[in-house]
């Protein structure tokens, strides 16, 4: 970030001397973009492209800037122009996929999404067995393998029962913390943790390729909720303070490895606007470093029960969520877990959210129990929490009347 900040005056001086130097406009635009100064970036992309429209990489970056402003159709046009100039351009196809998916065009979006395997940071698995094409393979053994984050695995494991109808034996390779939870998903014959020796199989498919293979549209998303459940053997019990009428689980930070994490995660202090609502007990669903933020809350830390020492895997988290009335979370695996369990969950979204939450709607076709609270401008969490506080107070009032 510091290098981009230092580069801005250099490129500005260059343009003062040579205002028609397209590459300087592109470099300045990129530096502004990396500083989240999106309007300045867009202005210089436009000036530079008017001078030289032949760089596919610039159309790609311009599209990303437009998407960050919520101008999705303009962004799609930029990605398509980048592909016109350079048809075999994996990053442009990938960005186009994410934009089409966010727009709700799942068939075309998931078709383009297959280009992810051409990206340098996303190499495909090298199996001798063929990729499954979606056809009926009764009697065959299929391997479904997780490929991205924990939330992705929870979201797309919903396809296991559909695959089971077409194949004889379903093996799922997934992240170790999910193994016990996924034993409750129907259609799975065998679970293997990532890194363990795989059993014999005939065909394979990555989990996030299943919507493409099965021709999913917005209208045909398999959303039979719940499709995971709390294992019956689990006995983790929540303590509720005296006078508690409503139990709410909260999560405010996702994985720091996610490239969008600085936009989707937030400071725990924002939740303090909810802590004065009487009759509500709050439970932290965070694990590891974000849970340490609780000690900085001062007076408010008494309002939140820190469960991090009890949450060893997703079965533990599922046992807690099952006892809650509501989950309020940023876009993280907790949102997917609560949604897959059918628990009411309010998901707090940044202005340009992940593709799966679409745009301009409060509901999710993936999770019927989800309600979406969106930023109305980039970085504006204050208005989001004002709406959440109002909605939580109204929900409590409704519950008291029942």
Predicted regions and their residues:
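Alpha-helical solenoid repeat scaffolds of the TPR/TPR-like class and their adjacent stem/linker regions
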Residues: 1-326, 331-402
